[in-house]
């Protein structure tokens, strides 16, 4: 199978977690599929939420929702540094007393992911591949909102193959429901053997993978990033590419 890979990075990012009546806005810890599709929609020149009107979905999501992607954090333990940024909001509806209200956002810092896109035989896939290979973006690309410029580099086209083994480390974010747990190597006495050569880590977060067709609210799945060996359950979306194992979703 043909796979488009590129590195996506930025100095800061903000992927807002929906909150009601809150003046501290928190960010998801990673770019998620819906936000990534929005960025790809900007590459293609598709409309967003502001131009949705009465349509079921915003244009970028309607056209790109069936694209299979995989997201691989480019750091050692799955967590980026975070910092609270404070803004002054003096619009009339922000404060019933008419004063200045501080709005706080949690920004991710120095973010970087490898992004994988499974290329199918459709016109949208072909155009997306051509645009990214040639850095021909219709609109400016951002990491969540327009305070956070995104950079794409290291673009390459790779060949992947289905991965059907029962146990493996997984190098991308993957769905928790796709595994049966984690493999524990036994020592000669039948006890779990410790790997003293490295520290194991496990990052888990509920991240948006789709939009609800009526409310357009995020539909989330528990995703994991870890260096532990996993026991695979549903192998249909796992792929081996460049000697790494990733899951498409």
Can you name each region flagged by the protein language model?
Residues 8, 37-39, 107:
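Long, contiguous hydrophobic alpha-helical segments, chiefly transmembrane helices and signal peptides
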Residues 74-249:
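Internal, well-folded beta-alpha domain core
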Residues 1-24:
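N-terminal, Lys/Arg- and Ser/Thr-rich interaction peptides
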Residues 18-91:
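Glycine/small-residue-rich interface belts in oligomeric ring/scaffold proteins
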Residues 13-15, 45-50, 122-125:
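Primarily extracytoplasmic ectodomains and periplasmic/lumenal surface modules that are beta-strand-rich
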């Amino acid at each position: 199978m043909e796979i488009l890979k590129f590195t996506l990075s930025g100095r800061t990012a903000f992927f807002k977690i929906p909150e009601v009546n809150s003046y501290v806005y928190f960010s998801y810890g990673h770019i998620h599929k819906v936000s990534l599709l929005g960025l790809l929609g900007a590459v293609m020149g598709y409309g967003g939420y502001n131009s949705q009107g009465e349509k079921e979905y915003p244009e970028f999501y309607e056209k790109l929702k069936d694209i299979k992607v995989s997201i691989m954090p480019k750091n050692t333990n799955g967590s980026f540094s975070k910092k609270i940024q404070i803004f002054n909001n003096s619009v009339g509806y922000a404060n019933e007393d008419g004063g200045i209200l501080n709005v706080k956002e949690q920004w991710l810092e120095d973010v970087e992911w490898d992004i994988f896109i499974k290329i199918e035989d459709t016109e949208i896939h072909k155009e997306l591949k051509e645009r990214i290979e040639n850095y021909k973006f219709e609109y400016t690309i951002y990491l969540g909102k327009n305070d956070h410029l995104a950079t794409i580099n290291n673009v390459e086209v790779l060949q992947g193959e289905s991965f059907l083994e029962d146990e493996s480390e997984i190098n991308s974010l993957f769905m928790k429901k796709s595994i049966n747990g984690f493999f524990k190597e036994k020592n000669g006495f039948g006890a779990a053997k410790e790997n003293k050569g490295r520290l194991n880590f496990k990052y888990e977060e509920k991240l948006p993978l789709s939009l609800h067709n009526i409310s357009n609210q995020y539909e989330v799945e528990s995703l994991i990033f870890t260096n532990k060996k996993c026991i695979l359950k549903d192998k249909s979306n796992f792929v081996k590419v460049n000697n790494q194992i990733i899951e498409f979703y």
